[in-house]
Amino acid sequence: MNASQVAGEEAPQSGHSVKVVLVGDGGCGKTSLMMVFAKGAFPESYSPTVFERYNATLQMKGKPVHLQIWDTAGQDDYDRLRPLFYPDANVLLLCFDVTNPNSFDNVSNRWYPEVTHFCKGVPIIVVGCKIDLRKDKVLVNNLRKKRLEPVTYHRGHDMARSVGAVAYLECSARLHDNVEAVFQEAAEVALSSRRHNFWRRITQNCCLAT
């Protein structure tokens, strides 16, 4: 995987181009996921994202796929600005922190309704982040005091199915675990959806012509 930071630069024109938009609560791990994939470095300090974009290139079947990865702000203050970054999205990554049940609930209660309103028909992948913290004793004990527990893989998978997501994946940006697989899946889903829509339009046009 070859990645390059975007500082206003455009993705190369050769090969396929895919726009990936990350959505989720502030602090859920989506920025770290993007930065580890695009730059190979985990950010040790948390700085709330406004809006960021990175370019990265994947090789799929020997051909380059250029990803435009948009990281959106999850804070309420940016509710009016966030929809400006949805147009032309090819795939949406709805992210949550597996150690934060509230961010998990917000995928179905907040983020799914928002993206389906602004991005009708765009495929969704649900991503559980920070899986390395599932076994953090201090964090788990703090959750137990509130009668809570980390979100399990099966709960994440079931929720993803309930919102009609095409896939559910988990990752740890800190450990670089499954990070590339998330974006590989995003690229494959986006390109598959694009091919499906192309042939559907061709079929519809043929039917209209007969």
UniProtKB/Swiss-Prot annotation:
Pfam families, alphabetically? Ras (PF00071)
Q: Name one GO cellular component term.
A: plasma membrane
Q: In which tissues is it expressed?
A: Widely expressed.
Q: Name one GO molecular function term.
A: protein kinase binding
Keyword Lipid metabolism recorded: no
Q: Which biological processes are named by the entry's GO terms?
A: actin filament bundle assembly; actin filament polymerization; cell projection assembly; fibroblast growth factor receptor signaling pathway; focal adhesion assembly; lamellipodium assembly; positive regulation of cell adhesion; positive regulation of cell migration
Name of the protein in its database record: Rho-related GTP-binding protein RhoD
Gene responsible for this protein: Rhod
